[in-house]
A protein has these predicted regions:
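Secretory targeting signatures
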Residues: 1-25, 173, 261, 275, ...
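Extracellular, repeat-based ectodomains that mediate carbohydrate processing or recognition
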Residues: 22-436
Length: 466
């Protein structure tokens, strides 16, 4: 099992062949429609609320890249003209993240220019109709990358990775108490000689939670620190993983006084998916449990929480050339988990799952079984006991990947990128009746290595054996 001991600060993007666009309307979904404009558009994000459907992505042309934003006010049937938030004269604006609540939209990204990398943020207080000029959150003294953002009332929180002069990486936190008009001096959450990475930021009322992976003790562990005063001060970090193996790629969800976390861990010799929870606001955590227990490596988990149900999905190695999407659920707030089930279970490699729930459960992933990489999705209406046959959303002539998903009121909103290297577009589709495809997908030869999907986990130092 190879463990890379440095945080990877570059994203390896999948390469496709030829121009692309979705060709057939998938059952139960609208035709995939293009929401980006000219240029090479990648890394889409999507969010759905009662205020609208919001999307951001990066778009490259003429040697530079910018962050773009678009919004739909009619449930995703149409989108407004994309707005360039960064408007960089030069340099690369990358890795956008955003939040929206009550028509307040905050978008953050990384700007790389002349060997310097800084964190910027733009905000809109009118639902994305207009945006203020971006402000710089990092101090510019070190390389800063991979920002996160969270929102609670008038408080806006951000965290990112900073590379120090000794090549170690640390976690930085900054906050605003005035709706993002101004930010305080960035706070170093870690001061390690090793590497800290993959910050995950959450907030709930006055509580702020920040988790990350960290090898300052010699092996990678998952730490969490919380603030009870809106980010003014933080408690001593808690080691959530407490295992003897390497732990990485954390995901954290906060729901009231409950804090849930999943990650990948190789204590058993292979990577497995571990889960822990806190019922006292993150002060203490239960002993981590292995919820995968499968042969081969399990990695890159995603999960969601709906009432007392915990739903987890991940990429599972089946053989040296095949990967599938697995799912496990808990119906008792994470006290126990059912045996994992295989959602993709097909001939081609499947990877990079996303999951959402609005009572129903939706899992999407990238799959090469149709003959090239397409975006597939499945749904459960019985709390994960059974799933419908997967639906192919993209049906594109070239490659589709980097899928992101939002669910609201029994409707699923999907974005992804498709096309050739250097010529990608961002497309959108929403569910209508969600009638599944029936019958097995055709068995076809593998056209791209699943390793291309796996390396998209660019912020983690842990990698599955490929």
């Amino acid at each position: 099992m190879k463990v890379l001991l440095s945080i990877i600060l570059t994203l390896f993007v999948l390469a496709g062949v030829g121009p692309s666009f979705a060709q057939a309307e998938p059952p139960g979904f609208t035709n995939a429609s293009r929401i980006s404009t000219a240029g090479d558009s990648e890394l889409p994000q999507v969010f759905a609320s009662g205020d609208g459907i919001f999307a951001v992505w990066t778009q490259s042309s003429l040697g530079k890249s910018d962050v773009f934003f678009s919004k739909s006010t009619d449930g995703g049937y149409t989108f407004g003209s994309p707005v360039n938030l960064s408007e960089s004269a030069k340099g690369q604006s990358l890795y956008p993240q955003f939040v929206e609540k009550d028509n307040h939209v905050y978008v953050t990204w990384q700007l790389s220019l002349s060997g310097v990398s800084t964190i910027l943020m733009a905000k809109s207080l009118d639902g994305g109709t207009s945006f203020e000029k971006p402000i710089q959150l990092s101090d510019g003294s070190q390389l800063s990358a991979f920002p996160q953002i969270a929102l609670s009332g008038n408080h806006v929180y951000s965290s990112w990775i900073e590379k120090s002069a000794d090549n170690s990486t640390n976690i930085i936190f900054a906050k605003s108490d005035d709706q993002g008009n101004s930010f305080g001096v960035p706070l170093h959450m870690t001061h390690n000689v090793g590497n800290s990475g993959i910050p995950k930021l959450s907030s709930d009322g006055n509580q702020v939670y920040l988790a990350w992976e960290d090898n300052s003790r010699g092996d990678y562990e998952i730490f969490l620190s919380k603030s009870s005063d809106s980010g003014t001060s933080f408690h001593v970090p808690v080691d959530m993983s407490t295992t003897t193996g390497q732990s990485g790629t954390p995901e954290v969800i906060v729901s009231g006084n409950n804090v849930y976390a999943v990650w990948m861990d190789n204590t058993s010799g292979n990577y497995d998916i571990f889960f822990t929870k806190s019922t006292d606001g993150g002060d203490t955590f239960a002993k981590p449990v292995d919820i995968s227990h499968l042969k081969g490596d399990s990695g890159y988990p995603q999960f969601t929480v709906w009432k007392n149900n915990i739903y987890v999905t991940w990429t599972q190695t089946i053989s040296g050339t095949n990967y599938d999407i697995f799912f496990a659920k808990s119906s008792n707030n994470g006290d126990t988990f059912d045996k994992p089930i295989n959602l993709s279970n097909n001939f081609g490699p499947s990877g990079w799952p996303k999951i959402a729930s609005d009572g129903n459960i939706y899992v999407s992933w990238v799959d090469s079984t149709p003959g090239k990489f397409d975006v597939l999705i499945t749904k459960s209406t019985d709390s994960g006991a059974t799933f419908e046959n997967p639906t192919n959303l993209s049906h594109s002539k070239t490659e589709s990947y980097e899928n992101e998903m939002a669910a609201l009121d029994n409707t699923v909103y999907m974005v992804w990128q498709e096309g050739a290297s250097g010529n990608h577009t961002i497309v959108f589709s929403k569910s209508t009746t969600f009638v599944p495809e029936f019958g097995p997908l055709a068995s076809v030869a593998l056209v791209l290595s699943i390793g291309s999907i796996i390396v998209v986990s660019y912020r983690s130092s842990l990698k599955l054996k490929i």
